[in-house]
Amino acid sequence: YKMVEWNETLDLEEFYQEAERRGHRNNSNQKSMIDCFKNEDKWNAWILYKHEKAIGSVVAHTFPEMNGYRILARTCVLDGVRDGKGLGTGRRYIVEHQNLTSQYFVPTCIEWCGVDSDMYVTSNNEEAGSQRLVNKIYFPLLEKQGEFSKVKEINYRNTEQIVWKLNAHKFLENLRKYPCIK
């Protein structure tokens, strides 16, 4: 796996088409995945590649509502390309960080924001992507490990969202305990 910083020269047409086909509307074109963040004070996006094929995306940006950064925005890993079966495969894949989000997206966002920065993630109960699983399973399990904490509910970008704060040091400490997906 390889994380590549997004830039205008990347050919993501196949990725966008596959995201559209799978119903990931926020990752189905540059306008919805990238351009909507260009008005943020600071932002960056990355594409995850496996064998030179784009298989995932993530964005981080300033989050003035919380005086920090919002990470894991536009997170997408296309089904059928990861070794596990995703969030629904079991508690172990989450708490032992045996998923691409934990092993690639979160560390990349931490590196960009700075390990001591205030970093937040938002989740909701919408059907989009795997939001319900993220909201009901992923973050609550990581909260029990002290890696995230539920902060509050806000209306953000016209959607009711739960804000989770990342404890970057604890997350990285726990991540180092487990093997990396190759």
Enumerate the predicted regions with their spans.
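Conserved N-terminal entry element of GNAT/NAT acetyltransferase domains
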Residues: 1-10, 170-182
